[in-house]
């Protein structure tokens, strides 16, 4: 039995973020499907055992139990630094720059992208509801401004953190995947350095393995 367990749903952006990290590190693990359609993540057993906030993913590595996807990915990258892809830098200055862009993803990009993904993907597909046009119209120009900054950064560097693929890039993958099936795709395509970066990171075998789990859902 694998010491590492990932509890979640492959439809969840946060679960995909952790799974992509596990695959990049080529770690033996067990994926435990959480049936969110019946609210399994809100039931007492899950709340008391895995995540008191009733969200996915939850993560186990032996006796260690974690939740919050970015905390999990950072742990994996540090604990298994000698395995698979090196997702963090050992050099403190390079890692500081990578950490800046990890924060940018969580605090600038994701705050906007998640709202758009909810309106344009999750509401229509999962809830049968129409997108709130006002929210979409408010957030599209906000995302465009963030992507202008990304375009400038990626004109100087192949990846956000530097010359190597790191967590700063990986963390973007799940929301990018969903937004690329919407009208928002044009904002990424119109910026050549951003577009090239996305083509690179979305073609990674580890990411494709994580996405393949959706076909089993």
What are these regions (language model features)?
Residues 77, 175-176, 211:
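Active-site-flanking alpha-helical
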Residues 36-37, 165, 216:
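Positions that flank functional sites
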Residues 206-217:
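C-terminal helix/juxtamembrane-tail motif
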Residues 101-203:
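GST-like fold's C-terminal all-alpha helical module
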Residues 1-137, 141:
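GST-like domain detector, emphasizing the conserved glutathione-binding G-site
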């Amino acid at each position: 039995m694998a010491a590492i367990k990932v509890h979640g749903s492959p439809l969840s952006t946060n679960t995909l973020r952790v799974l992509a990290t596990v695959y990049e590190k080529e770690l033996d693990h067990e994926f435990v499907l959480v049936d969110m359609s019946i609210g399994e993540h809100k039931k007492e057993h899950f709340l008391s055992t895995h995540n008191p906030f009733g969200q996915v993913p939850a993560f186990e590595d032996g006796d260690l139990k974690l939740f919050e996807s970015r905390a999990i990915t950072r742990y994996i990258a540090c604990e298994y630094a000698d395995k698979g892809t090196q997702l963090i830098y050992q050099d403190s200055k390079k890692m500081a720059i990578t950490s800046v862009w990890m924060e940018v993803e969580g605090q600038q990009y994701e705050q906007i992208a998640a709202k758009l993904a909810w309106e344009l993907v999750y509401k229509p597909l999962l809830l049968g509801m129409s997108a709130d046009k006002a929210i979409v119209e408010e957030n599209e120009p906000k995302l465009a401004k963030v992507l202008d900054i990304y375009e400038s950064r990626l004109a100087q560097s192949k990846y956000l953190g530097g010359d190597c693929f790191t967590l700063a890039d990986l963390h973007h993958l799940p929301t990018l995947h969903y937004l690329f099936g919407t009208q928002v795709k044009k904002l990424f395509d119109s910026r050549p350095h951003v577009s090239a970066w996305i083509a690179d990171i979305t073609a990674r075998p580890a990411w494709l393995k994580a996405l393949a789990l959706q076909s089993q859902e």
